[in-house]
Amino acid sequence: YEKNHDLAQALWKEDIRECKILAGMLQPIETFYPEIADIWVENIRNIEIAELTCMNLFQHLPYAPAKSFHWIADEQEYIQTCGFLTAARLLMKKGDMTERASGELLDQAICAVHSDSYHVRNAALLVIRKYMQHSEEHAFQVCRLVEGMADSTLEGEQMLYNMVKEETEE
């Protein structure tokens, strides 16, 4: 498909599933400014659109790393979910980040496994998994963070511990 900013913007404004999917595919990166990204992410109302827009558009943005952290810090379910999904995709593409950024990402993701939102929890677990898959050092780092959760009575910590355990046994 040929990229087309005006068409993508018009499609996004339609409250129709297929229009939003196509908008994410047609939007040129060069004209998709951070302010527009924030408007789009605020209009995401379901997990399918969140996943597809992160895959087709958000992960390719030059400002995606900073924007994903900004979204992760948001309280709204789908904004936070998009932040984690975008970060997970960036980890699959690049995987490298500063120690400070990786520490912040892990802190936020570990906190998010306690979220009441199923989608936020799953996206947080995904970003932790992708972080671990990047290197043995990352996997070891996460293992150290969750080793005390083996006997936790908190559901989120149990899910995280079991996911990390599965990931390290593969």
State each model region's role.
Residues 1-170:
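Alpha-helical scaffold domains
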